[in-house]
């Protein structure tokens, strides 16, 4: 992986991770547990209860979960801020817990980290904040200048190099934090709720920056967040953690469009697809009676997102089709649409509709019945 060496050359799309490289592991958690406390014969708190998970090289991987699920503990294991109680954490082929202090310091230079709170030194300019880890590493003034200037250019802050944190906006402070995290030319970037203190517009600009860094530098990004919009925008894959265990994992698109675990469905319930109004859900039944209408969620993605399937459904089963709600959005760069319709729950209409779904390959979910 190459980092920019001059202010004039941050664009390196040709050096993006080649196809297939993402299958190699950057971080591997092998049977990892972590227990806090437990002194004097008292039981400890199991923050992690047996994690087996791999973060591929070159990926942007998101860990999501409820508060207290173990997200922050998991990410702190990746740079040796915490050690596992049992199991192994392997970063780029190195068992982190097996390292002595000197080797651990070397490893940490290959792992950058950005935080919700920017942790900038108020007495240092943007340039000097980015330079700090290089000064600690013992680099000379000319080498620091050659490293910091292109990084500030990369994050769009060349004109703010001499500004102090108090003179910067929240988004600009986070960009300084990102540049500082990249100063030691890491292979892995850890992000702990890095956008949660930012407004939506600034969040989007930071996400675009992280995507560009990932693409141009081939940098692996592992982030935790409670913001599902962040995950949809940036992640290539997702892992869901609950009570110290990975309960579901997969590509971002698969997790968001077809969540399987109850925890995943709960986390995503308000961020994907259609949320029905209360006046509809309050009258929803799971069994049909004579004269009822069935509510069906139709899911469109890939090529089906651009086909006139709703019009064809009306042509197939008749004009008595009501559209109750609908949305279309982009998840991990792919179109995804969701439409809730109702039509008579009679055997004849249901048979025609089911035949149409089978012929078109349309994904459907029966939500219930209303009078």
Curated annotation (Swiss-Prot):
Pfam families: ABC_tran, NIL. It is a peripheral membrane protein. Part of the ABC transporter complex MetNIQ involved in methionine import. Responsible for energy coupling to the transport system. Residues 27-268 form the ABC transporter domain. The complex is composed of two ATP-binding proteins (MetN), two transmembrane proteins (MetI) and a solute-binding protein (MetQ). Disulfide bonds: none annotated. SUPFAM superfamilies: ACT-like, P-loop containing nucleoside triphosphate hydrolases. Keywords: Amino-acid transport, ATP-binding, Cell inner membrane, Cell membrane, Membrane, Nucleotide-binding, Translocase, Transport. The keyword Methyltransferase does not apply. This is Methionine import ATP-binding protein MetN. It comes from the Bacteria. It catalyses: L-methionine(out) + ATP + H2O = L-methionine(in) + ADP + phosphate + H(+); D-methionine(out) + ATP + H2O = D-methionine(in) + ADP + phosphate + H(+). It is an enzyme of class 7 (translocase). ATP binds at residues 65-72. Its EC number is 7.4.2.11. Residues 1-24 are annotated as: Disordered. One of its GO terms (cellular component) is plasma membrane. Belongs to the ABC transporter superfamily. Methionine importer (TC 3.A.1.24) family. Residues 1-11 have a biased composition (Low complexity). GO terms for molecular function: ABC-type D-methionine transporter activity; ATP binding; ATP hydrolysis activity. It is found in: Cell inner membrane. InterPro entries: AAA+_ATPase (IPR003593), ABC_transporter-like_ATP-bd (IPR003439), ABC_transporter-like_CS (IPR017871), ACT-like_dom_sf (IPR045865), MetN_ABC (IPR041701), MetN_ABC_transporter-like (IPR050086), NIL_domain (IPR018449), P-loop_NTPase (IPR027417). The keyword Cell inner membrane applies. Gene3D superfamilies: 3.30.70.260, P-loop containing nucleotide triphosphate hydrolases.
